[in-house]
Amino acid sequence: MSAHVQVTREIAAPADILWQMVADVPRMGEWSPENESAQWLGGATEARPGATFRGTNRNGSKRWSSVGTIVEADPGRSLAFRVKAAGMNVAEWSYRFEPTAQGCVVTESWTDRRNPVLKVLSRRVTGVADRATHNREGMAQTLERLAAAAEQQATPSA
C-alpha cells in the first residue's frame, strides 16, 4: 500500500494568485524546505499537461534530482505532477485550491509511488528514513511560506 499525506491550510489570498505561484515550478524552491531549484525541460515554459521539469532537492548534505511531468493543470483550481527518478515512479504531488470568503483553502497532497527497491535506495540517496513524516512536516512549511508570500502579494500597499 502506498503512503499518502495531505496538508491543508487556509490562506488569505485569491486562488488564482496561489495557483500561479505554485504552477511557476522554477519558484518552488522559494516555498519548499527540500526543493532547491527546478527547470522546465524540452522547451516547456509553463504548467500544462505533458510539460516536464527537473527538480533538484536537498536534505542536509544529500542532494538529488528527479523529473516531474505535469498531469493536471486547471488554473485557479488544481495542479498535479508525477515524479520519476532513473525512469522509476517516485511520487505524485497535487495542489487543490478552494475559494473561501477570506481567500482560499490550499490542500497539498503527496502519494508515494516507489517500489520496495526504490524505497531502500532513496533512504540512502536522500537521508530520509520516514518519507511520509518528513513530507508532512515539509508540506506544512511549504504552505506556511506560500501563505506569507501570497498574503503579502494580495495585500494592497498603503
Per-region residue spans from a language model:
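Beta-strand/loop substructures that line and gate deep hydrophobic ligand-binding cavities in soluble
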Residues: 83-141, 146
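Short beta-edge strand/loop motif at the mouth of beta-sheet-based domains
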Residues: 6, 26-69, 73-78
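Hydrophobic ligand-binding cavity/cleft-lining segments
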Residues: 1-42, 145, 151, 158
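A short, structured loop/turn motif at beta-sheet edges
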Residues: 15-16, 46, 71-77, 96-105, ...
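Intrinsic-disorder/low-complexity, polar/charged segments enriched in Ser/Thr/Lys/Arg/Asp/Glu/Gln
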Residues: 2-8, 16, 52, 65, ...
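Hydrophobic pocket/interface hotspot
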Residues: 18-22, 28, 53, 70, ...
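Generic structural detector for well-ordered beta-strands
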Residues: 8-12, 39, 69, 82, ...
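A generic structural micro-feature
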Residues: 1, 47, 60-64, 85-89, ...
